[in-house]
Amino acid sequence: RLLRDRLAAGPVSLAVDIETTFHRGESRMLVAEFPGAARPDERVVLVAHVQEPGANDDASGCGTLLAAVLAMRQAIAAGAVAPPDRTITVLWGDEIRGSQHWLDADPARAAGVIAMMSLDMTGENTALTGGTFLIEKGPDPSAVHDRPSDPHTEWGAGEVDPAWVRGHYLNDLHLGVCLREARDTGWVVRTNPYEGGSDHTSFTRAGVPALLNWHFTDRYYHTNLDTPDKTSPEEMGHVARAVATTALFLGSVGPVDREPLLALVREAERARLETERRNAASEEILEAWRTWYAQARASVEALR
């Protein structure tokens, strides 16, 4: 009542002291797996983080990942696809710390990871939130060389260890899957250079080919206005289908897939070099891309 009376009389300024404490506690992680039928010690890992309280960040990522898992389970149970040769491991936990703990807890297990995808803010109703769906690529030369054809998001460029910039087919494979999903639906798919800040960071630092599925920029990001009315089931469906498709392909990719994968990577290399030449890239940048794509082709040729 006193505060109401003061407010009725005019503007009121408040000074507030808040006492807080920090303490250690347990952090739980939910782990689900599709056991590998032929190479169970080799793994594809999918991750969404649970600790952010927003609807898009990251309830939508957790829900999208669950939808992808249920779709894979249904397809395998129905005989539409074969069980994966490799184990597909699914993690819901604390962002970055949870992923790092999973990697550190069993180095032998971590050594078997062939690829990882993170799902973060995957359910945006972009008409309300702004931004678009993005694939944040595993580190390639665009993470080091700022180019007009490959701009960073408002999140901003992060520090990149040169050792992380190693070519792999994962970027172009997942982009191709997403573009196929978009072909008949009008889904907007774009990419951005590696920036870090979600669960793919832990795996990238560990030398694992990794990428992020997300949306940015979101005008409600990290505010109490990140609410369910700003999510889109259709957008979550697009991401879930693309992630499930890529994960199942990675789960059994082998020598029989070399030629189509090589064709995909070669076409991506051709398009990239053409774009960089058109934008007057230096010879240093062109050579960086040639090197990266040579490594990406080698990652395909190494399939066994």
What do the predicted segments below correspond to?
Residues 71-101, 109:
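Short helix-loop-beta-strand segments that form the rim/entrance of peptidase-like active sites
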Residues 21-24, 37-39, 50-54, 94-99, ...:
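Solvent-exposed loop/turn segments at secondary-structure junctions
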Residues 86, 219-270:
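His/Asp/Glu-rich mid-to-C-terminal helical/loop segments that flank catalytic regions of hydrolases
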